[in-house]
Amino acid sequence: PNDYNIIVNGIGIKGFIDFGDSIYSPVINDLAIALSYALMRSENLYKTLQNIIKAFNNNYSLSSEEIYSLLGLIKSRLALTLVMSAKQKLKYPENDYLSISEKNAWHLINQLDLVDPYFFIAVVRYICGFEPIQNSNKIINLLKNYKFADLFEFELNNTNKKIVKFDD
């Protein structure tokens, strides 16, 4: 759903054009394509991500496997956009529309390269109602309830402390 292919009037969406990308494929690909275009001009990637994924997940629950694949699928769609743009510019150099998404796609792919994939997965898992890190509640409960051996033979809280400064 490239936003340049949506026909709107003052009230709302009236139709879609250019079904060249329409194929039968896993539904997660539709979300990845929608996110790749929505995030291109987003001022707040995580807010946009949250709004779209939350709405999508309310209608189609994402599985853990789909969540783990999402960042790679978004980047793949951006790479495809860039390849097609370069190819079409060579074939039709006078048609600026064929490379209309190129600048924004480069910007977004560079932004996404800075995002830690595990952080991205944790954010999406949280948006979808999962624990951000699988089994994190079990680990947190274990840490809270486990009696660890003392590292020192004294209590750090009950020890006189002196701050030593090493600068001039």
Identify the residue ranges that each predicted region occupies.
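All-alpha amphipathic helical-bundle segments outside canonical DNA-binding/catalytic cores
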Residues: 64-74
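Generic secondary-structure boundary/loop-capping signal
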Residues: 3, 21, 59, 94-95
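Conserved ATP-binding subdomain of kinase catalytic cores across diverse folds
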Residues: 61, 65, 168
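Alpha-helical structural motif
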Residues: 27-30, 66, 78, 101-108
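Active-site activation/catalytic loop segments of kinase-like enzymes and analogous catalytic loops
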Residues: 28-61, 77-92
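Amphipathic, non-membrane alpha-helical segments in soluble helical-bundle scaffolds
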Residues: 21-24, 42, 46, 72
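ATP/Mg2+ or Mg2+-diphosphate-binding catalytic cores
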Residues: 81-167
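Active-site acidic catalytic loop and adjacent metal/ATP-binding pocket
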Residues: 1-29, 154-156, 163-164, 168
